[in-house]
Amino acid sequence: MRFLNKWKRLSDKENIQLIPYLENWIEKNPIHKIYIGCDSHNGPDKTTFATVIVLHYNTGGGHVLYSRETFPLIKDRHERLWKEVEFSVGTAMFLMENGLEKPDYIDVDLNPDPRYQSNSVLRAALGLIESIGIIPRYKTKSPWSISIADKACR
């Protein structure tokens, strides 16, 4: 699975080194939750993906890190949605492989209603996320990181 390696703080767009940054943040905030999500948008000739890591303080509020990457236009919706899942899962696996705790949730921009095209990817996505021991959330389950990723894509 692919992992994005150019990360920034959303608050000031400052580049960060992801693992040392997270280690420091977790040490200072031992009671917290971590959410990961990805969204994408198609432009006329390119597809932009934004993967976010939401660091949720136990007292409320959050701190957001993001990575944005652009690819040649991906016209196939299924392929684009699956790549969103891959970026989220790849990010979670990268964190765990580097000694960080397992994220609390991976949020996916997929709909449980079969009337929507994103539903075609939902079962496979949930299975993949659960197979690495992380709780998936999807539309109707309050996936915070997806709405943040949507804004980071633009």
Go through each PLM region and give its residues.
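Acidic, metal-ligating active-site segments
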Residues: I36-G37, H41-L65
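Basic, amphipathic N-terminal segments that precede the first structured/catalytic domain
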Residues: M1-Y35
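Acidic helix/loop or adjacent segment enriched in Glu/Asp that either coordinates divalent metal
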Residues: F71-K102
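Short, low-complexity, polybasic intrinsically disordered segments
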Residues: N111-S142
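Catalytic phosphate/metal-binding cores of nucleic-acid and nucleotide-processing enzymes, i.e., regions
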Residues: M1-R2, L73-H78, R123-A124, S131, ...
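A short acidic (Asp/Glu
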Residues: D45-F49, P114-V121, I148-A149
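Short glycine-rich phosphate-binding loop at a beta-alpha junction
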Residues: K102-L110
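C-terminal edge-of-domain segments
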Residues: T48-A50, P136-R154
